[in-house]
UniProtKB/Swiss-Prot annotation:
GO molecular function terms listed in the Swiss-Prot or TrEMBL record: structural constituent of ribosome
Family statement drawn from the similarity comment of this UniProt entry: Belongs to the bacterial ribosomal protein bL32 family.
Name this protein carries in UniProt: Large ribosomal subunit protein bL32
Segments of this protein annotated with the region Disordered: 1-23
Cellular component annotations (GO), alphabetically ordered: large ribosomal subunit
Extent of Basic residues compositional bias: 1-20
UniProt gene name: rpmF
Length: 57
């Protein structure tokens, strides 16, 4: 027998939304930090291939 679900409170909804937004903000901050480290040349935690032009051909 189908029973309607209880309505989720505004507080619970806002809490879930805040957690979701915080995770997205953390991911964006990490990506920005990684990009800055790549551009500054101080990246040490991963392999980043740098394309070098060969003029000896």
């Amino acid at each position: 027998m189908a029973v309607p679900k209880k309505k989720t409170s505004k507080g619970k909804r806002n809490q879930r939304h805040a957690v979701w937004k915080a995770k997205a903000g953390d991911a964006a901050q990490k990506a920005l930090s990684l990009g800055k480290s790549i551009l500054s040349g101080r990246a040490q935690g991963f392999v980043y291939p740098i394309q070098e032009e060969d003029s000896e051909e």
